[in-house]
Amino acid sequence: MATTATEAAPAQEQQANGNGEQKTRHSEVGHKSLLKSDDLYQYILDTSVYPREPESMKELREVTAKHPWNLMTTSADEGQFLNMLIKLIGAKKTMEIGVYTGYSLLATALALPEDGTILAMDINRENYELGLPCIEKAGVAHKIDFREGPALPVLDDLIAEEKNHGSFDFVFVDADKDNYLNYHERLLKLVKLGGLIGYDNTLWNGSVVLPDDAPMRKYIRFYRDFVLVLNKALAADDRVEICQLPVGDGVTLCRRVK
């Protein structure tokens, strides 16, 4: 999920019922879905996701589950989706903004060809190094160029060199929601025509459809407006074709067409 400590949450998100009371939607970090039925989501995981999950990704998921901010991780079904997507578009040069322990990063690295690359950025190297042994064990660490620190300066440096324009096949953004639009404007210069940008958490725990006065955790409420603005902006942006999917916490794919 995101890279900022303010976006970390306790065990699980909560929703308000008709009486305004709080109720827990899911009881474990393995459940990260907007589906109303826990049983249905567990069926998806048990039937189609976990049996096909590479051992290295399973190990990284289990390591991450012990971290106090484990809700920041990409869900297993979304990791499977990203892995398939990378293969479908034949991506070779990719970027990830917001790494956390690297579950989505590993999903991407495993999908890339041997000479594929990922420019990965996160403000917290410690979290990345927590998952690094799993990435190294999978034999894909050589594909990753990890940069610790804010992503915007790195993007600006890339844009300053003409050779980087339109050079990336795929970018996955799972970081500070208040900068998503800043990332978007820069990434449109760096992603090739026909290339994809994926924005994570675009349904933001389902809060995008809640009334303003609905009970919400503080960090959900704080970033909710940024997500709402992003969704509206992407829907109106004729430089991209978009597809918003209820995978994980919501992911919006943008295909650059201009």
Curated annotation (Swiss-Prot):
Binding locations of a divalent metal cation: D174, D200, N201
Molecular functions (GO terms): caffeoyl-CoA O-methyltransferase activity; metal ion binding; S-adenosylmethionine-dependent methyltransferase activity
Biological pathway: Aromatic compound metabolism; phenylpropanoid biosynthesis
Binding site for S-adenosyl-L-methionine: T74, E96, G98, V99, S104, D122, A151, D176
GO biological process: lignin biosynthetic process; methylation
Family: Belongs to the class I-like SAM-binding methyltransferase superfamily. Cation-dependent O-methyltransferase family. CCoAMT subfamily.
Function, in words: Methylates caffeoyl-CoA to feruloyl-CoA and 5-hydroxyferuloyl-CoA to sinapoyl-CoA. Plays a role in the synthesis of feruloylated polysaccharides. Involved in the reinforcement of the plant cell wall. Also involved in the responding to wounding or pathogen challenge by the increased formation of cell wall-bound ferulic acid polymers.
The protein, known as: Caffeoyl-CoA O-methyltransferase 1
Gene that encodes it: CCOAOMT1
